[in-house]
């Protein structure tokens, strides 16, 4: 079976080797195209470092919610005894109305 002839191994009748010359120049499109600029990386949010104020505010919010829920029931003690004084006034006014 005859071998395939490649352009590199082609020989004329003379026995001289004919080689295909490849162009050494790059195309104008490729040489004129600049390298694309690298996008600046966006700063990432650090989840490892937490603000100490954030923890305090969350705890305070949770406590406030508990106080509000308990205040709705009417059994929650409030600061400085304000609720106790109001309850006492209510009971006195109810007693006075009955007399």
UniProtKB/Swiss-Prot annotation:
SMART domains: HMG17. Residues 1-99 are annotated as: Disordered. GO terms for molecular function: nucleosomal DNA binding. Residues 1-25, 39-53, 62-72, 81-93 have a biased composition (Basic and acidic residues). The modification Phosphoserine is found at residues 6, 78, 93. GO terms for biological process: chromatin organization. It comes from the Eukaryota. The keyword Electron transport does not apply. InterPro entries: HMGN_fam. GO terms for cellular component: chromatin; nucleus. Belongs to the HMGN family. Interacts with the ligand binding domain of the thyroid receptor (TR) (in vitro). Requires the presence of thyroid hormone for its interaction. Interacts with transcriptional regulator SEHBP. Interacts with nucleosomes. This is High mobility group nucleosome-binding domain-containing protein 3. It comes from Pongo abelii.
């Amino acid at each position: 079976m005859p071998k395939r002839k490649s352009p590199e191994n082609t020989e004329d009748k003379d026995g001289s080797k004919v080689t295909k010359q490849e162009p050494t120049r790059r195309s104008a499109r490729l040489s004129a195209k600049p390298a694309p600029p690298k996008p600046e990386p966006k700063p990432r949010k650090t989840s490892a470092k937490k603000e100490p104020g954030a923890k305090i505010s969350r705890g305070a919010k949770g406590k406030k919610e508990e106080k509000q829920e308990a205040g709705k029931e009417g059994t929650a003690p409030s600061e400085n005894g304000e609720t106790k004084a109001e309850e006492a006034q209510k009971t006195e006014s109810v007693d006075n109305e009955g007399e």
